[in-house]
Regions:
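Active-site-proximal alpha-helix that buttresses catalytic centers in soluble enzyme cores
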Residues: 4-352
Length: 352
């Protein structure tokens, strides 16, 4: 008697945040509206959020943002999309034909619903979802995961799903960041390293900790993030500090060699502060404290984008030099580096 064993068909879904379809004001406004209307990004009541986003932010910010996106845009298009598609192809090659790799953006294109349809049509019944945000946050990771769940339900598609919520402890991910940094740090030209992470409202961090752990472990006082434990594993701030410690260790940095700060704040209310210290203020203060040469990382971004190339690479450099700084160097993001692809291979195969 012959017994046939049914083999599961495996797939991986990579999800990044998103990018406008073009640097035109129209497309930038469309992107901002979809992004900022997400209840996980701006968690205000719907009507308040709608007015804030559609009447104020998208109206006045889109023309300014379009100018910045034009600086970033290449002949191929948006770097975030270009690298996303490259990584998809490289990971597909790494994993081989037995595991199908799909790629989507949480906002705009390629959309999550299209990727889910692709996986369903391929007959994938064992799916790994990897949101491409190293540090878990409700405004990025949770939002993407919930969107994937929503689309799976809409399409009546029920594969076995494994979610990769965070990968700050993945050794190859850390090694990839350190490898890029050491190209510059080992030249001996720099006095200080800045690890600049995307900011989020303090309120989000506290609320997420209470939601995830049912306690008020998060004090935002510097002490609760000194160690990374089960009690703060999904605390965004704790993950940022843990990432910094691990990269510093991989680069043989002393604690006094680096600073951690938070960028890209969008304070919608005076009493709604974002995570501190603020990267732009830390940058301005460096020269005043005798720091003239800085090596800057953006470890919350796995591909170069507006926040890395323009904000950290150009705007912070200008702030630094205006205040007496001499040498500002942005470390490139992981983009499509071999170690980053190896990290994704591990995460896909659950060998983290």
């Amino acid at each position: 008697m012959v017994t046939f064993v049914s083999m599961s068909k495996k797939g991986v879904l990579l999800v990044n945040l998103g990018t406008p379809d073009s640097p035109s004001v129209k497309d930038v406004r469309k992107y901002l509206r979809e992004f900022l209307m997400d209840k996980y990004v701006i968690d205000l009541p719907y009507l308040t959020r709608w007015f804030l986003v559609n009447v104020i932010i998208a109206t006045f910010r889109a023309p300014k943002s379009a100018i910045i996106y034009k600086q970033l845009w290449t002949k191929e298009g948006s770097p975030l999309l270009i690298y996303g598609l490259k990584v998809q192809k490289l990971l597909q090659k790494k994993l081989g034909v037995d595991i199908h790799v799909a790629f989507a953006m949480r906002y705009q294109n390629p959309p999550i619903n299209k990727a889910i349809k692709e996986l369903k049509n391929k007959g994938i019944d064992d799916l790994v979802v990897i949101p491409l945000y190293p540090q878990w946050a409700s405004s990025s990771t949770k939002s993407s995961i919930e969107k994937v769940k929503e689309e799976l339900k809409k399409q009546h598609y029920s594969p076995k799903v494994r979610l990769v919520e965070t990968f700050v402890k993945n050794e190859k991910f850390i090694a990839a960041i350190a490898e890029n940094g050491n190209k510059h740090w080992k030249t001996g030209k720099y006095d200080k390293v800045l690890f600049s992470y995307h900011g989020v409202p303090e309120r989000h961090v506290i609320k997420d900790c209470e939601s995830n752990y049912g306690n008020n472990h998060c004090k935002l006082d510097g002490n609760c993030c000194k160690t990374y434990t089960d009690k703060n594993r999904l605390c965004y701030r704790a993950q940022c500090y843990e990432t910094s410690r691990l990269v510093a260790k991989a680069m043989n940095l002393k604690e006094t060699d680096y600073e951690v700060a938070f960028q890209s704040r969008l304070e919608t209310r005076a009493r709604d502060p974002w995570l501190k210290p603020y990267s732009d203020i830390v940058t301005a203060d460096f020269p005043k404290n005798g720091v003239k040469n800085v090596l800057a990382f953006s470890p919350s971004f796995i591909a170069d984008c507006l926040e890395t190339t323009v904000e950290v690479g150009d705007e912070f450099k200008e702030i630094f030099e205006e205040n007496g700084g001499e040498n500002w160097q942005l470390v490139e993001s992981l983009n499509d580096s071999p170690l980053w692809i190896e990290a994704l291979e591990q995460l896909s195969l659950n060998n983290d």
